[in-house]
Amino acid sequence: MTESKGPDTPGGSAAPKKKRKTLLDRMRPYAIGVMAMVVVFGVSAVIGAHVRGKKDTKVSEPTGAVAAAQRPTAAPTDGASPSPTAAGPKLAIPVKPSAPVTVTVYEDLRSPDSKAFQEEYGAVFKQLLATGQVQFQYRLVTASDKSYGGTGALVAANAAACAQDQSRFTDFVDQVWKNQPTDPKDDGLASEKLMKKLAAKAGKIKTASFDPCIEQLDHEGWVDKSQQDFAAAGYGDVPVVEINGTVVKDVHTSLTPAKLRSQILKEAKRVVTLRTAPTNTPALAG
């Protein structure tokens, strides 16, 4: 009996059987594809984190920001102006600029003390603005984030700077005060959704530019710089008030709206007197 060699093939040998793919062989192309996607997304995340890290250090000043005012100390000579001069980084938001007296208010949008101060002194501030002799500069700080944890003060301050880009700082901050959590440990102001809602309530804020500004924290570096400058000055707790660069005493104890108004008007009178004082320039001989 002869041995069967199967179907006839050249040379009389049997055709090799096709090897069957295992489950691992069938899954290998998909596994490679998934791994490639993981690598791509991983690299993207690293790049994004790197860009975000770089962005945090950039000081992007909001539109109209100004440097700190300094106290006029002498009558004008040789063309020098007795008006408050400015120096240093532009960390203040001015309200009604170009006045003989500059009142600077350091405030933390998450701080109940800052909110209480604005509620108590807001009416007097409006009266003083109406005189045309006073401008206000607001410095936003974030000490409450360090005290209680979270980022509510930072997010709110950045959003206020975004509103300032559209000349809506005061209107937006008014909404922040109205919606500030009663407990400073509550980090509710860290919500981007809330910031967008407050912008809508403030009115006349274009979402096309405001929303990306808060989502990307465009002014985060500026807010951080303001806080660093405030901490380095050793002012203590907010609120802090300056009149032409001089710190007002007893803000947390015996100061009242009437007393502050009196101090501001006294400084305005002093500056006006400096402006009208005769110079020491000798008269030319006829």
Residue map of PLM features:
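Short regulatory "switch" loops immediately downstream of catalytic or recognition motifs
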Residues: 1, 178-182, 244
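C-terminal cap of thioredoxin/glutaredoxin-like
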Residues: 2-59, 200-286
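Extracytoplasmic low-complexity, Pro/Thr/Ser/Ala/Gly-rich segments
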Residues: 56-123, 127-132, 138-140, 269-286
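A structure-centric signal for secondary-structure junctions around beta-strands
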Residues: 100, 156, 237-238
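Structural alpha/beta surface segment adjacent to cysteine/selenocysteine redox centers
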Residues: 109, 115-193, 279
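An acidic, carboxylate-rich microenvironment
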Residues: 171, 193-194, 209, 259
